[in-house]
Amino acid sequence: MQNVGPTEPSKSQVFRCPAAGCKAVYRKEGKLRDHMAGHSEQKLWKCGKKDCGKMFARKRQIQKHMKRHLTLKKHSCPTAGCKMTFSTKKSLSRHKLYKHGDAVPLKCSVPGCKRSFRKKRALRIHVSEHSNEPLSVCDVPGCGWKSTSAAKLAAHHRRHGGYRCSYEDCQTVSPTWTALQTHLKKHPLELQCAACKKPFKKASALRRHKATHAKNPLQLPCPRQDCDKIFSTVFNLTHHLRKVHLCLQTHRCPHSNCTRSFAMRESLVRHLVVHDPERKKLKLKFGRRPSKFLGRGTRCPTPVVEEDLSHLFSRKLLFHYKTRLETNLSGLFNERQLREPAEPEVNLSGLFQLPQGRPKAEKAA
């Protein structure tokens, strides 16, 4: 089983390098795997050229290498007998310095030691011999490979014997790391919490379980004043409010012989297994919202809404400060100010210009 330690839940998940003394942090797990390959010297990336076949530990290394195949190597070494060609002048000058010139050697910094080396790895191994650090030596006959890291030795051993399956009952040895990953998918995934040794079949269930072992777990208290219940998930808090305080058990069992009702739809789906034992796999879709556009003739179910929910909440939590009442609200409106105070008009006929009617003709006597 794979032991996965508890981690604190966070909104933005980060992946930290577990190597000692390394503080690298990445947002994507693939970036971390690429970085860890540099620590363990696992060369997972292979050049696809027919005549090349070089292996690299990191993705950016093979990307840089592939550019060499695409670019023309115009700069050739002028030394007699050397047929090396390079794409840049800088690479050519480095080649002439270390291969044919007098390159500055890497000298040992230990007092009294006059050894010098051309590669940094050889210098690190030599310095570890002065400090009496334990060296990891390859035990394959005729190899004699040395390293100061046990992880690098394990990566070196895989070059001799391939990549062995980590399961105890499986003796499969894959020639490449990619073939090993393909083989591991055939084994059933078994995850185990490192804190309580509880097994899980899904990685999502293990992540939710690890939140219970966090140093600062999420605490959601019940908003009612006379209730001291505290929950770790929003689902449990919602279930508590609907069942205990609101008594909203609207999800009834459809079977005629069963009178059970539940506050949450997920609880009803789990209950249906009692009536149908052959139904083993449940695919619950949490947080599913109804479609915005319904078909013709369909009606959206009317939600049960309680009018007065004030008894569920504490007023101290809702109102952190006293409200201020504004008595003079005249400053909020942009009204035209009158120069002189208006007087009430009794006769308003002078404000209107009404057409005068023609005088009626008098009847002749």
Curated annotation (Swiss-Prot):
The keyword Zinc applies. One of its GO terms (cellular component) is nucleus. One of its GO terms (molecular function) is zinc ion binding. The keyword Lipid metabolism does not apply. A zinc finger (C2H2-type) spans 15-39, 45-69, 75-100, 106-130, 136-160, 163-187, 191-213, 220-245, 251-275. Transmembrane segments: none annotated. InterPro entries: TFIIIA_Zfn-C2H2, Zinc_finger_trans_reg, Znf_C2H2_sf, Znf_C2H2_type. Keywords: Metal-binding, Repeat, RNA-binding, Zinc, Zinc-finger. It comes from the Eukaryota. SUPFAM superfamilies: beta-beta-alpha zinc fingers (SSF57667). Pfam families: TFIIIA_zf-C2H2, zf-C2H2. PANTHER family: SI:DKEY-208K4.2 PROTEIN, ZINC FINGER PROTEIN. p43 is a 5S RNA binding protein which is a major constituent of oocytes and comprises part of a 42S ribonucleoprotein storage particle. The 42S RNP particle comprises four subunits each of which contains one molecule of 5S RNA, three molecules of tRNA, two molecules of p50 (EF1-alpha) and one molecule of the 5S RNA binding protein 43. This is P43 5S RNA-binding protein. It comes from Xenopus borealis. The lineage of its organism: Eukaryota, Metazoa, Chordata, Craniata, Vertebrata.
